[in-house]
Amino acid sequence: MFFRPDFRPRCAKWLIATGLFLMLGACVEKPTTLERVKEDGVLRVITRNSPATYFQDRNGETGFEYELVKRFADDLGVELKIETADNLDDLFDQMNKPGGPVLGAAGLIETSKRKQQARFSHSYLEVTPQVVYRNGQSRPTDPGDLVGKRIVVLKGSAHAEQLAALKAQTPAIEYEESDAVEVVDLLRMVDEGQIDLTLVDSNELAMNQVYFPNVRVAFDLGEAREQRWAVAPGEDNSLLNEINAYLDKVEKNGTLQRLKDRYYGHVDVLGYVGAYTFAQHLQERLPKYEKHFQTSAKKEQVDWRLLAAIGYQESMWQPAVTSKTGVRGLMMLTQNTAQAMGVTNRLDARQSIQGGAKYFAYVKDQLDDKIQEPDRTWLALASYNIGGGHLEDARKLAENEGLNPNKWLDVKKMLPRLAQKKWYSKTRYGYARGGEPVHFVANIRRYYDILTWVTQPQLEGSQVADGNLHVPGVDKTQPPAPTAPVVPASSPEKPAL
C-alpha cells in the first residue's frame, strides 16, 4: 500500500479540527424552558375542567385559573394552549411525560407527595378545606364524628392525603377516592343524600353552594392552605422564576384581587324576585322601554313580551348595569356579541334591546330545522344563556337516553348533567353550568306569562303603567312571601315546566 508523504499530518490536522468543533458544540447551551416556550410561541397548560379552574360558557373560555394563566401567556407574548386532565393523577402524569405540558394550573395544593411530582410556584389563593354535610342530618363537629360516615373525595387530591393522615390516627375512619367525579359531583351527591360527607376547598364551595341548597359546612379541617401552580421537576428554573415574578406582579398591581372578587366575591343572582317586585317594575320601569322592545321585536319577528322578559331576567330593566364578568346594559351583552350585532354603546337602552333581539333571533335561527314551536323558543333561550355548543351536547345526551332532543321537557333533564363529570367527559364541549339555563328559561317563562296577562288588548300601551295595575295574587300594600310567589298559569299552548 502506498501513502502520500503528507497524509498523516493532514489527517492529524483534520482530527484536531473535528475534535475542536465537537468540543465547541458541546459547550453551546441548550435553550431554557422559558426560551423554548417563547421560541415555540405556545404555553401549554394542563388544568381541570371545573367551575373554579376552566370551562366554556356562552362568553367562551373562562374560569379563575384560565384567566390568571391567560394573562401570564399574554405577558410572555405567546399563545395559550389549554389541555384538560381526566383527574388529578392524570394531570401530574401528563406533566411528567417527555413533551408534555410545562405548567399545571388547577388549584393545586403543595403536599409532601406532590413535591416528588412537581415543583411549585408562589401562592396566589388561600383556601380552607371544609367538611360538608347535608342539612337535616346530624352535623359533625370534629374528626371523630367522621367515623361511620360514607365519605367520598377526589382521587389523588390533597383532601385524600388529609383523610389518610386522619385514618392513621383513627383507623375506624373510612373513605373512598373517585377519579370519575369532580367537586360539583361530590356536592350534588351530598345534596341528594347519596353520600354523607365530602371535603372541598372553601372557594369551590362558595362558588357552587347556591346550586345545592341542602349542603352545609360541618367544620374546617385544618388550617388554611395555599394554591399554587406546578412545573415538571425535570425542568430548569427559568419558567418557574418567570411565573413567580408574574404572580408577585399581579398581587401588587391588584389584578389578582380583581379576579378573586369576580369569581369568589359576592355574586348577585337574578332569580325569581317575587311577583310584588315584578309588578312594581312593570309600572315604574317597563314604560320607559316598552316601545324599544316592540320596535326591535317586530323587526326580528319576536314576541316583544318575550324580549322584555329576557331583559328583565338579565338586568331587571336597568340600562346601566355592568356585571363583574364584563357583560353590560339592559340586555347584558358581552363585548363580542355587541360588536357582532352592531351595538356601539351597550349602555344605550335602545341599542342594547336591538342587539339582544337580533342576537336571540340569530340563536333561534341556528337551531335544527326539526325543532318546532314552542320548544324552539325555549331551546333558543337555553342556547342564548349557555351557548349553542353546550345545548347540542345536552340534545345528544337526550337522544342517547332515548328522549326527544327536539323537546325542551326532555333536553332540560339533560342540561344539569353537563356539570357532572360522568356525563360531560363524553361531550364535545365539556363542562358547563347546566343548571343555569334551566332556571334561566323557567324565570323568563314566568315573567312572560305575567307580561302576557297584563298586556291583553285592554291593557296595551300606557295602561301598563297605571297605578291600579293588579297582578293576580299580589297585594300591593303587602308584598307576598318570597317563598310562594303567585303567577298566572301557563296558557294552553305553552308546555308546563
Swiss-Prot record:
Q: Where is this protein found?
A: Cell outer membrane
GO molecular function, a single term = peptidoglycan lytic transglycosylase activity
Question: Which Gene Ontology BP terms does the record give?
Answer: cell wall macromolecule catabolic process; cell wall organization; peptidoglycan catabolic process
Region feature Non-LT domain, mapped onto this chain: 30-267
The record's region (Disordered) falls at 464-497
CDD domains recorded for this chain? Answer: MLTF-like, PBP2_YfhD_N
Its keywords, alphabetically, are: Cell outer membrane, Cell wall biogenesis/degradation, Lyase, Membrane, Signal
Q: What is its EC number?
A: 4.2.2.n1
Q: What is its main location?
A: membrane
Membrane topology annotation: Peripheral membrane protein
What this protein catalyses is:
Exolytic cleavage of the (1->4)-beta-glycosidic linkage between N-acetylmuramic acid (MurNAc) and N-acetylglucosamine (GlcNAc) residues in peptidoglycan, from either the reducing or the non-reducing ends of the peptidoglycan chains, with concomitant formation of a 1,6-anhydrobond in the MurNAc residue
Sorted alphabetically, the Gene Ontology cellular component annotations on this record are:
cell outer membrane
State the active site: E314
Q: Where is the composition biased (Low complexity)?
A: 486-497
UniProt xrefs under SUPFAM superfamilies: Lysozyme-like, Periplasmic binding protein-like II
The stretch of residues making up the signal peptide is 1-29
**Region labeled LT domain — which residues?**
268-497
Q: Which family does it belong to?
A: In the N-terminal section; belongs to the bacterial solute-binding protein 3 family.
Role summary: Murein-degrading enzyme that degrades murein glycan strands and insoluble, high-molecular weight murein sacculi, with the concomitant formation of a 1,6-anhydromuramoyl product. Lytic transglycosylases (LTs) play an integral role in the metabolism of the peptidoglycan (PG) sacculus. Their lytic action creates space within the PG sacculus to allow for its expansion as well as for the insertion of various structures such as secretion systems and flagella.
HAMAP family in the record, alphabetically? MltF
In the record's own words, the domains note is: The N-terminal domain does not have lytic activity and probably modulates enzymatic activity. The C-terminal domain is the catalytic active domain.
What is the name of this protein? Membrane-bound lytic murein transglycosylase F
Organism of origin? Pseudomonas syringae pv. tomato (strain ATCC BAA-871 / DC3000)
Which classification does the entry list for the species?
A: Bacteria, Pseudomonadati, Pseudomonadota, Gammaproteobacteria, Pseudomonadales
